Amino acid sequence: MVSWIISRLVVLIFGTLYPAYYSYKAVKSKDIKEYVKWMMYWIIFALFTTAETFTDIFLCWFPFYYELKIAFVAWLLSPYTKGSSLLYRKFVHPTLSSKEKEIDDCLVQAKDRSYDALVHFGKRGLNVAATAAVMAASKGQGALSERLRSFSMQDLTTIRGDGAPAPSGPPPPGTGRSSGKHSQPKMSRSASESAGSSGTA
């Protein structure tokens, strides 16, 4: 049995890269017939890829599932079967032509709703961001005011400590001794003067 990896490689190479190269050649040569052919193929392949997303989940257990996928891609690409052109002309084009107006209306409504939803969620996001910024600013301002208040209280305490008067008390012991020393020469001088005056008399 073919594994998932081999099936995926075959689909990528022959279902995507090979048609992409020939689509490039059709655009380069401006061949309208080839251009239309590959446009029909890409529409069918887009539907196949969409369906494959779900069938890989729910039908991967089916016997020969991956072989059937490879065979389907080969059928789409074969110039003999022209599977993509057949599916497009028989099923896809008539269905899209009959439902085109409804599909366009649904797309317009989806576009408008998605735009409104985007604007709504954008406004809500801006409101939440603004509220968070205001709360952060208020908390930061409160913390800053508390910090400044604590600093001002410390400054007042320091100023009071520097301007306090010196404590009153008895003079230091050295002051009395120095005054005694200074007064002793004065007393001896006055005694000598009195002795001199008495001798003269």
From Swiss-Prot:
Chief location bin: membrane
Taxon lineage: Eukaryota, Metazoa, Chordata, Craniata, Vertebrata
Modification Phosphoserine, positions: S152
Assembly description: Interacts with OLFR992. Interacts with SPAST and ATL1. Interacts (via C-terminus) with microtubules. Interacts with ZFYVE27.
Biased composition (Low complexity): 188-201
Membrane-crossing residue ranges in chain numbering: 1-21, 35-55
Superkingdom classification of source: Eukaryota
Alphabetical UniProt keywords: Endoplasmic reticulum, Membrane, Mitochondrion, Phosphoprotein, Transmembrane, Transmembrane helix
Family in the record: Belongs to the DP1 family.
The gene coding this protein: Reep1
Function: Required for endoplasmic reticulum (ER) network formation, shaping and remodeling; it links ER tubules to the cytoskeleton. May also enhance the cell surface expression of odorant receptors.
Keyword set includes Protein transport: no
Coiled coil: none
Biological process, per Gene Ontology: endoplasmic reticulum tubular network organization; regulation of intracellular transport
Tissue expression from the record: Detected in olfactory sensory neurons of the olfactory epithelium, and in total brain.
Gene Ontology molecular functions: microtubule binding
InterPro entries: TB2_DP1_HVA22
One GO CC term on file: membrane
Residue numbers spanned by region Disordered: 158-201
Compartment(s) where it occurs, according to its Swiss-Prot or TrEMBL record: Membrane; Mitochondrion membrane; Endoplasmic reticulum
Membrane-related topology note: Multi-pass membrane protein
Protein name: Receptor expression-enhancing protein 1
